[in-house]
Amino acid sequence: MSLFEVKNITVSFGGVKALNDVSFSVNKGEIFTIIGPNGAGKSTLFNVISRIYEPSKGQIYFNEENISKTKPHNISRLGIARTFQNLELFENATVLQNLLLGRHIFKKTNLLSEVFFTPKSRQQEHEYRLKVEEVIDFLDLQHYRDTLINGLPYGVRKNVELARALCTDPQLLLLDEPSSGLTNEETIDLGFWMKDIQSILGITIIMIEHDMSFVNKVSDRILALNYGEILATGLPDEIKNNADVKQAYMGE
């Protein structure tokens, strides 16, 4: 069953097409990876999905609802969360504080309730804390929960950003170069986390990634982009053996 669908998306910058008539669908519970050389249009596509960029043509559907005109700040409320290649964390806040901020989109109490810490506000805070602690346990971040972000190794910071995305209870998780900057051991761990996110939490994942060994291990299907157009979509072995993909992406 299709959870997410892109139909005929075109994006132009100054007359240059960054994406040209791109269409694909992602099944519920799938790990779907987008690959391609630098400048292929991968980040542009993620920015269109996140509603940061406005396409000149095409539609985006999530849960069969057209979200093409949805405001960027409302995307997370629909159940779509995203991590970034360049980490977007609060350096002088703790891991716990960063994760609690990931729950702010669900805030239902007003400022007055917050100031006087009313029963409703206390109940909401308790619910937020329970969810955050679940995610901390899930990603094995207990040791770092009260540590400031600026005191953490890069690999742990990446995990914290993933955790913050999970704190929004997404149905769809967008991962932008999740293995970038990680050691081999950390990349292996990331693969296990992703499979757990898929199988245990039931979250669908769309990922941009350059590490083809990692891509082939974790992906259910792969889409290859080049110069803003789709070269191929298929299973990892199909993409690995596709002549056009080898030429464009692997230089063979």
Residue ranges and their predicted role:
Residues 2-252:
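Glycine-rich phosphate-binding loops of nucleotide-dependent enzymes
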